[in-house]
Amino acid sequence: TIPKPMIEIGGKPMLWHIMNLYARYNHKNFYVALGYKGEVIKKYFSKISKGWNVNFIDTGQKTMTGGRVKRLQKFIGDETCMLTYGDGLANINLDSLLDFHKRHGKLVTVTAVRPPARFGAIQIKGDKVTSFKEKSHLEEGWINGGFFIIEPKFFSFIDGDDAYLEREPLEQAVSEGEFFAYKHNGFWQCMDTKRDKDNLEEIYLKGAPWEK
């Protein structure tokens, strides 16, 4: 088995496609939080010569999502950080996302997308997130698309290795009015199942929307 971000779509790992999206918007300085089979990711991206500066941070085998983000703090310092998972592809305009984040001036922006169902649900009033639930069986509304922007102060919301990003840290951001949603109505698809992979391969062959 290989880590999910290394599953290939169109002959390239998911993580490569995600980084390529950022690079097209001139974001080429990457910090990859390594966990399960992190050496596979490190080996592949150590050979990439696209002008990307890829830094590998071993965040531990059993560290939770919030803990992994917390461990990146000393490398990111006091800069605004763009953060994403390694299992979703989208045609998000990252310039617009960053502009939106700067305009509202809060600690966290999440990209909200329309489901294919079965994901964490977000309730939004205006642009402000009023509720964030990790999982939902609702078939409408907005879900967490996984493309975040965070300010340095947000790291203080994360207790340690056992923290789930999607629970206390983001729920605290909601309760303090520091969590806003950028609504993305374009293409978004995550890859959780073999069916998702087959679907993404089919989309790729027709002309990958995340590359346009």
Predicted features along the sequence, with ranges:
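Short alpha-helical oligomerization interface
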Residues: 1-5
